[in-house]
């Protein structure tokens, strides 16, 4: 059985990706900070072999331990790494920002992705045409008002994806960068620190992406033949033109 590692798997994109890959016949390695949610998800994913572990990707030693602790039958059959864990915290001018928020975003979105990729790539090397899929953002393609550090972190993901594609070319590992636009998940609740009213307004007047849209995109990427590599995908709602312009009704 082929296995896929998914970070940030307890909700949003990660949860939907797990469900979609189960339907493709993948075994699943699911990492997230909230083990209770992973346990609930594991009970629902009855079609596949599902391995779960609590993990904060900001902790390099914990990342290394989680990968080294994988059972042999799983570690020998890792065919995909999906670096999904990420977040935005706060939105406003840089001079009004909080360094704790900056560190949380950089440590999760950038350093966490690096730690996980560094630990898992040696497992992917065993399987030609395996995948690293990085969840970036439209914020990794452009910047918007109040996005400063979050946009910077996702620009870093975009750059790391391009660099990995060079680094892993001779190892025959495919690297894809996915840049979603506005998607209705817990993202805005986290960004606005639990302010549900402000978070809801983000999606008013148009139909945003759903987590399932991203999961289906990843299923398409993984299902391409060996000679086809999807390098970069920007996916937005039909009502979105760029990082900040929407056709709201």
Identify the residue ranges that each predicted region occupies.
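Residue(s) in the substrate-gating loop at a strand-loop-helix junction
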Residues: 137
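C-terminal helical subdomain
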Residues: 177-178, 197-244
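Conserved glycine-rich Rossmann-like NAD(P)H-binding loop of the short-chain dehydrogenase/reductase
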Residues: 26-40
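The beta1-alpha1 cofactor-binding region of Rossmann-like NAD(H)/NADP(H)-dependent oxidoreductases
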Residues: 54-66, 99
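Active-site helix of classical SDR
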Residues: 117, 153
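Conserved glycine-rich cofactor-binding loop
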Residues: 10-11
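Substrate-binding pocket helix/loop in short-chain dehydrogenase/reductase
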Residues: 92-94, 101-104
């Amino acid at each position: 059985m082929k296995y896929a590692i998914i970070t940030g798997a307890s909700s949003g994109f990660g949860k939907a990706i797990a469900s979609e890959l189960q339907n493709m016949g993948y075994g699943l390695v699911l990492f997230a900070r909230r083990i209770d949610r992973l346990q609930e998800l594991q009970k629902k994913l009855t079609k596949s072999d599902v391995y779960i572990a609590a993990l904060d990707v900001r902790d390099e030693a914990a990342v290394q331990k989680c990968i080294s602790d994988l059972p042999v039958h799983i570690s020998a059959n890792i065919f995909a790494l999906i670096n999904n864990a990420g977040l935005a915290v706060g939105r406003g001018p840089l001079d009004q920002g909080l360094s704790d928020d900056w560190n949380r975003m950089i440590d999760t979105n950038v350093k966490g992705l690096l730690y996980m990729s560094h630990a898992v790539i040696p497992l992917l090397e065993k399987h030609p045409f395996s995948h690293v899929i990085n969840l970036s953002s439209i914020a990794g393609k452009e910047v918007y008002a109040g996005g400063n550090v979050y946009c910077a972190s996702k620009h870093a993901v975009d750059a790391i994806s391009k660099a990995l594609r060079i680094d892993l070319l001779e190892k025959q590992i495919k690297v894809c960068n996915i840049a979603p636009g506005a998607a209705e998940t817990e993202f805005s609740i986290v960004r606005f620190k639990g302010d549900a009213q402000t978070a809801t307004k983000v999606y008013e007047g148009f139909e945003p992406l759903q987590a399932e849209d991203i999961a289906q995109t990843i299923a398409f990427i993984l299902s391409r033949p060996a000679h086809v590599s999807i390098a970069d995908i920007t996916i937005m709602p039909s009502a979105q033109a760029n990082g900040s312009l929407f056709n709201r009704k």
